Design a protein with these regions (language model features):
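Non-transmembrane, aqueous-exposed alpha-helical and coiled segments at domain scale
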Residues: 1-424
């Protein structure tokens, strides 16, 4: 039996989906335990290219059971759209290989609307939300103002619960934002079209996972986003509204006794960021555009150009510590092949002093990157599958990162396809 978490070390978009898709060959169950439809996990395999926002990335493996845990922001509309897209490419999805926790809270129609209304109100002070309703959803969850997926089996009680929530929510929608109020007819339409359609997948997933654990199954826990977007440990308030750490896996999955055997932290070979907030190493102009195009750095959910920069050792080391990673997968090393020399941020300059410690969020806006340049390899490495076949300069780059973030790099990704990987 093995329990493994796949987590992001930086701002998200590190390549968690492609690593889950690769490593699930050795696992029986994959669990998404937090987050919602606000970030995408890109997977390229024999079925095609996919950007998964809610479906666990193990959905392409025939013998893997995929679970959406109680910690997930369950967006029925987006989930059904993903199921259609994936099954349309020949992937089989049934209640046997996709299970939704009866204790997962439903993302309701007003959550997405309120997200957009608040971003519009904030104007130039906005957080850069993907407008998928995540912050309003989690706010309501902690106010106990959401609907559990299990309530879908009790339509009469559910409608009464929704009516109470609607009356309360309309005070905000109309009273604060001046937007049109919701009606029960609108909610009935939403239930008929989306809510009830996911009922076949809803079950006691915590009970299922306990049985899987007791029978010696290998279970993988797939996180969304990364350490620097964690609600408690990220760059607050430019975070997501859930905990993106491996430590949340027991709570968000329903396996309270869970002990993780390994925590694989995913690190991109350079830095990217979607959304607002301090980004110490940010590149601009032509230099940034070259890197963005080389790495196809556009948001999987929004299509927005990602902010890009050199690898930030200070932020990455902090992310490794937050996640307590046991090993690292370094992704997109091949993207840097066009550079003659490769910049790396080794320290920050803050108030005239050098530091290699990640500062408190308030201070980050004043931090400046201290860069060191490494020799590039200036060639295509996407066909290489053995560590010793990499150019010496590429190996030097990887070992430098390994030594300075304090965690062994076991996997080196040299392309987006499943087999474009070097295992050390």
């Amino acid at each position: 039996m093995s329990n493994c978490a796949i987590v992001g070390i930086n701002w998200g978009d590190e390549g968690k989906g492609r690593m889950v898709d690769l490593l699930t060959e050795d696992y029986n169950v994959v669990v998404r335990y937090q987050g919602g439809g606000n970030a995408g996990h890109t997977v390229i395999n024999e079925y095609g290219k996919f950007a998964l926002h809610l479906l666990p990335s193990g959905i392409f493996r025939r013998n893997v059971v995929n679970v959406l845990g109680n910690g997930v922001a369950l967006d029925a509309e987006n989930l059904l759209g993903e199921i259609r897209d994936v099954t349309g490419k020949g992937v089989k999805i049934t209640p046997e290989n996709l299970k939704i926790s009866e204790r997962a809270s439903l993302l309701l129609p007003w959550h997405r609307d309120l997200d957009a209304l608040e971003e519009a109100r904030l104007k130039d002070r906005k957080y850069g939300s993907t407008k998928q309703g995540i912050a309003p959803f989690y706010s309501d969850k902690y106010q106990k103002k959401t609907v559990l997926a299990g309530e879908l089996f009790y339509p009469d009680e559910l409608r009464e619960h929704l009516r109470e929530l609607m009356e309360w929510k309309n005070l905000i929608v109309s009273g604060v934002y001046g937007a049109p109020a919701y009606t029960m007819a609108m909610l009935d339409e939403w239930l008929d079209k989306f809510g009830y359609a996911i009922r076949p997948f809803v079950c006691d997933t915590a009970g299922y996972l306990r049985e899987a654990q007791a029978s010696g199954k290998n279970i993988m826990f797939e996180a969304q986003l990364g350490s620097l977007r964690d609600l408690d440990y990220g760059i607050y308030p430019y975070t997501t509204s859930s905990n993106t750490t491996a430590a949340f896996a027991p709570i968000g999955s329903g396996l309270s006794s869970l002990k993780l055997d390994s925590i694989v932290g995913i690190v991109k070979a350079y830095s990217t960021c979607v959304g607002e907030g301090p980004f110490v190493c940010e590149m601009f102009g032509e230099e940034a555009e070259k890197l963005r195009q080389a790495g196809a750095e556009y948001g999987a959910k929004t299509g927005r150009p990602r902010r890009v920069g050199p690898l930030d050792i200070v932020a990455t080391r902090y992310g490794v510590q937050v996640q307590a990673s046991t090993e690292i997968a370094l992704t997109k090393l091949d993207v840097l092949g066009y550079m003659e020399s490769i910049p790396v941020c080794t320290h920050y300059e803050l108030d005239g002093k050098m530091t290699d410690s990640f500062p408190f969020p308030t201070l980050l806006a004043k931090a400046r990157p201290v860069l060191e340049r490494f020799e590039g390899w200036n060639c295509d490495i996407s066909g290489i599958r053995k560590w010793e076949d990499l150019p010496q300069s590429a190996r030097n780059y990887v070992t430098y990162i390994e030594e300075h973030i304090g965690c062994p790099i076991k996997y080196v990704s040299v392309g987006p396809e499943r087999d474009s990987i070097i295992i050390r």
